[in-house]
């Protein structure tokens, strides 16, 4: 009999900024749970992890809109997510959040390693600034027209319509979500992940993937072949993971970018799980063991972050396993529109979970 395989099941981290819709369950969480259950049944060692993403502008924008603290928003929706997973029978080894001390420490450790290895540097760039609110407008604090597909409600970090990654300065006719003002350009210093240094290694790795879904591989290779651009990994925000010493000298009010820290959550969750089991080094069996396998269950809009940026972070850190597969699903539609939590399209997981037995709901979605 062959030895049990080590299977890491890494599942997308939902923003704790609002209820998640049925597309999230059908596209990421239920497939991951079925996959993990199978591997447990046949005797493999499964580590299925995820958690609530508690940083970034989705949370701070919601808090600003409601006039409450970001922590109040996080506490509300993290509790809702945990309840929903229980209702629909999702079985985790660990469901945590990016708000833990452990996650902050692991994120800062990766930041330091990448900086020490020459993959992070500072740059000054012009970013959108709201003259009325007198503050910079990172990510979802600005909306405008997508330069790629013409969608008129694209956000400053990504277009919901075509899925392309964006910078706020890419938007056509941008408007501040704080005041409705037309932003100005103003210089600000930030840390950048030097993705351009990974161009050849990443492309070689991607071209060697076999068995991946065509739309995942085509998107990742296409994005990389266009030429990887260095990407800012800090933001002008008060909410998020602190920039670690000795790199915290570029100015007040800056934090690590949410997507740099969110994908690190798969690693920090594994370390937290290992600590909880009383064997703090157990995480290495899934992350440093060359025979271990890792599967990332995500939605289409997260492909670039998981198939391009996260592998670059892992390559730059060194010694950690790259993804075995990234079985990302396409968008779920609701009455003809793409289901979207940020745009309020589609019913929430909780709405269905409160009305249907879990087995009936799971059967209908598979």
Which positions does each model-derived feature cover?
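Structured secondary-structure scaffolds
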Residues: 2-50, 102-106, 172-366
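N-terminal, positively charged nucleic-acid-binding surface of large information/translation enzymes
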Residues: 2-205
